[in-house]
Amino acid sequence: MATNGHFASIGVDNDKTAYEHGVQVIDENKEFNPNISKYLSLENVTHAGFNYHLISVFGSQSTGKSTLLNHLFGTHFSVMSDSERRQTTKGIWMSKNKREGEATVDPTLRMADNILVMDVEGTDGRERGEDQDFERKSALFALATSEVLIVNIWEHQVGLYQGANMGLLKTVFEVNLQLFLKDKNTTHRSLLFFVIRDFVGTTPLKNLQKTLMEDMARLWESISKPPGLESSSVHDYFDFQFYGLPHKSYQPEQFVAETKKLSLRFREGQRDPSMDARRGEFSEGGVFLPEYHRRIPADGFSRYAEGIWDQIVNNKDLDLPTQQELLAQFRCDEILREVMIAFDEAIVPFEEKQSQSARLGEPEVLGGLGAAMRSSRAKAVKNFETEASRYHKGVYQRKRAELESKVDTRLKALLQGQLNAAHKSGINEFSEAVSSSVKSGQKQGAGYDFAEIVNEEVKKAIAKFEDVARSTVVEGTTWSDYKQELALYEKELADVSGRLRREEMRRLANRVERWVQSRLGESVGLEFNALGSGRAGGGAPETGEKPLEKAFWDRVWNVFVETVLDAERRFTDRASSFDASLEEVDVGLWRLRRKSWGVLRAKIDEEMTEGNLLLKLRENFEDKFRYDDAGVPRIWRPTDDIEGIYTRARESTLTLIPLLSRFRLAETSAPPPLDRWIGHTPSSATPADEEDLPPIGGVDEEEGKSLDEEMMILSEAKRQELTVRFKKAADGVYVEAKRSAIGGMTQVPLYFYGLLLALGWNEIIAVLRNPAYFFLLFICAVGAYVTYQLNLWGPIIKMTEAASSQALVEGKKRLREFLESSDTGRQAIAMSAGSGRSGEQYELSDLSKKGKARTSADEDMDDL
């Protein structure tokens, strides 16, 4: 004989051979086996969900319970030897139905899938004696977990109290009320299946059923019931079925046949509403009705059973609904963790990449993020729903909400990061695209519509942002609405567009200002150049008429106004393509007028520098002094009124100094209306629009200068200095003219030619008679003429002077060397040195261009 205690005890590895005879759920010492889940996994029950059934068998010790289960379900529970009577099953054992899938005559009559059978230790054994604690606890455990309770009873024990296990059944009824007392909303039902052993048929089965049901009714009436259940019936909580089996030893063939027939009753069935157990009508169909199932998923059974037994063995009030909730809490947490592991594998790489991009300050739009988010979320929710939806609905829904919250929190952060990356990269790409299009238009030289470029790029940027957003969002979630982010993106695009437009208008203004500067430089320069011409003809306009000098500033102002008006037209026409507002155009024109005035004033200051002004005054004076009214150069003669012409020309030129010293219009004898022309500061101008503008007197009140002070070109001291210097220059011109006139009066006396002819007659004849002399004279004359025509006499004279000076220096040097080579010379040199005079030595390389010794000033000039 072998006992169940020898097989698969607690702690054995999950090798399938170790569980050949089943697994011990609870040992004789009331210890729960933690390897139940391993056994269920090996038997492929863990993933069955609700598609499993649990049966427990009750009965007195040594009544053949294990034998019955082995024949019904093909299990290998240990059985008692026929040669002795003793306890075989210790504790509670469990095994899976081994006859699952066996062929039957009727294919519709087949055993249910995944039937788990629990063999409970027999009652009324001498090993435990009067200790009924384990008996009660095991009954409570079996009732809390099993759908069907098989009561193994012999026919001759029917009608007895102890022999028919009436005490055990009373315990079952009592613990049943205790078990489901706290869950009054649901009536949990179980099936009590009486298997009457050694049934010979002398007493009809119906009579045995009637006797047992009368005993059940008396037992139910005898137990104390909680308030509200006093009138309850045993049929409110239990269903009953009965089956008789022949004697195993005396009728072995009939026993085997009947057990096989009985095994087919362990299939799924439906309640027949036409049958009433109170009238003795009992079903003979499938025993597994839906209402019997405890609704504990197979993967959570081990945990649930352990929790139930812990409550039972510690004598705590067993609250099955609470246990189911605790199991649901535990299993849902486990499932949630498993689901999150798979979720992390899909999402963490994107989170790390996004985090790294954020740390580097280079936001990146992650490809494939949306598909990964949708797929991982759907898988997580689906897997959780598949595994956890079988548990307590309240716990499942709460944990599902927790899962969705965790998943959505992380996915929302990814979506936000993706939208931020699309936002920043889109803004950068938009700015670069607009700048590139503008540069391309400028290079092509053709006109380009800035507003059209901006509008086109804005459409592209928004479309790209929406594509990224749509590809990333997870449908059906409240956090996938990106309208706010899109609105912020559109707002920043508008801000950037405005900034780019202002920058482009600023560049346009700069180009227009350079154009104004160029035009004013030419036009105003011509007006100042005209001051240098004091005559008509070549120095006047093409008409030959000399412009009036007193209207000089009128012409400058008119040229300035016309140039700026032309620039304003250019600016306005170009700004219209920028879609600029009227306020922006007004600010641009206002800045253009102020900048243009600065350009004009800078040009005037450049022309009015002391050197330039003296040059123009001298040119003006010389034109009036050296040329007549027709523009013909004067040839001075002693009879000319040089003093009168000089005085008139000088006084006429001197009138220019007070004219040029102040910007004043001849028509009004007042400064030009600069303040009205520039206008007031536009209300839309910002401090940034004004910060680079220099103040203008008479326009800016805070400048503290009046318009007259702004129009002051030359101060009084400058005017006096210019007057003095000009007069000195004019006096030089006058002296030169006077010398020219007097020089024309100096002539050689006629008698000198007669004297020259008389004294040099012989030499003249000698030269004329001698061809060589004559030819030499001719060559010299031609050379002198050519030299004169080429203006080379001056350089020749300078070279001659330089050569003679160098020869003198070289002669002194050689003389010194000669003296130093003799004793007498050295003594003379020593005496000369003692007298305090040191001889000057000059090298050829130290001579200046004029043949003189080079000074430090000459060296500085050569460096420049």
From Swiss-Prot:
- At the top level of its lineage, which domain of life is listed? Eukaryota
Q: Give the Lumenal membrane side ranges.
A: 769-771
Q: Which UniProt keywords apply?
A: Coiled coil, Endoplasmic reticulum, GTP-binding, Hydrolase, Membrane, Nucleotide-binding, Transmembrane, Transmembrane helix
Q: Which residues bind GTP?
A: G59, S60, Q61, S62, T63, G64, K65, S66
The UniProt record lists the GB1/RHD3-type G domain at 49-305
Instruction: List where Acidic residues composition bias occurs.
Output: 688-701
Note the coiled coil stretches, chain numbering: 480-506
The record's region (Disordered) falls at 675-701, 830-864
> Key word Membrane present in the record?
yes
**Into which EC class is this enzyme placed?**
hydrolase
Membrane topology type: Multi-pass membrane protein
Query: For side Cytoplasmic, which residue ranges?
Result: 1-747, 793-864
Question: What protein am I looking at?
Answer: Protein sey1
User: What's the encoding gene here?
Assistant: sey1
